[in-house]
Structures are given as C-alpha cells and as structure tokens.
Amino acid sequence: MYWISPNNYQVLAQETETDIEKKVLYSSKTKQIIKDNPNLITIHSHPDSFPPSIEDFNSNYENKYGLGIVITHSGIVYMYSSQEHIEPVYYKLKVDEYYLEGYNESESQIKALEYCMSHFDIYFKEVTCDARRGNGYVLRR
C-alpha cells in the first residue's frame, strides 16, 4: 500500500511486506505520517480483483484519507472515498442479499456498494478511459 501527498504527488509512506494475507500492517512511522497528513491518496492492490472492501471505506474514513485507489489484478481500477463508517455486518448482509438474487460475488459487492452509496456518504467509481474521446483521469501538478 502507498500513501501519496495530494499536494505534490510524492509517496510519503509505503507498506509492501506483510505476514497476514489481505491485511496491511502500519508501521509506527506510517501511522505518524497518516496522522500528520490528512487527505492522503492511498493506492493498493486487490489480488482477488474485487472492488474496494467495506474495510477500505472505513479505513478511508477513520484515517481521513482524501481518496483511495484500488488496482485489481484483472486490470480494473476503482477510486473511492468515505465520510462515514459503515458497519461491516450490514454491508455483508447486503452482499449476501444480492448473491442470493443470482449475482456472482464481485457483482454482489458492487451492487452492495452502489446501495450503500445511495444511503451513506461514500463514493466509488470504476476508473475508465476512452482514448478515442480523450476522456480520462490525469493528475496535474
């Protein structure tokens, strides 16, 4: 995982080694950087190619990050942010509800996030770029 300054786009911290699968362990140095720098941009990968997890949203809120970016191993990129905590049990129930309707796991998570986005102060979007139209996302310095 990387923490990037929104002011100059410099990497302020990184945690790329972990003994726990699907978990990022923050060093004391990283914790201090997060505390001293609100609105950081975070970037991390999801090897299972799922969208941002509810834990990603809650971490974004609790750590006052400005924007989160998830890059999946299938090549899909998501951006997200959160202005409030969502109970993981609630989110899991919504995912299960969509799964029982016949959606696969990834689709169920996306549907649950869309539902939460309409009922809570969170935001997420798949990042796309249409090169023919010149539409894309560019960070400007």
Question: What are the residue ranges of the model-derived segments?
Answer:
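Short HxH-centered metal-ligating active-site micro-motif
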Residues: 16-64, 73
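Detector for glycine-centered tight turns/loop "hinges" at secondary-structure junctions
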Residues: 8-10, 75
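Divalent-metal-activated hydrolytic enzyme cores
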Residues: 65-141
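Amphipathic coiled-coil signal-relay and dimerization helices
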Residues: 10-15, 80
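Short beta-strand scaffold segments in enzyme catalytic cores
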Residues: 1-7, 68-71
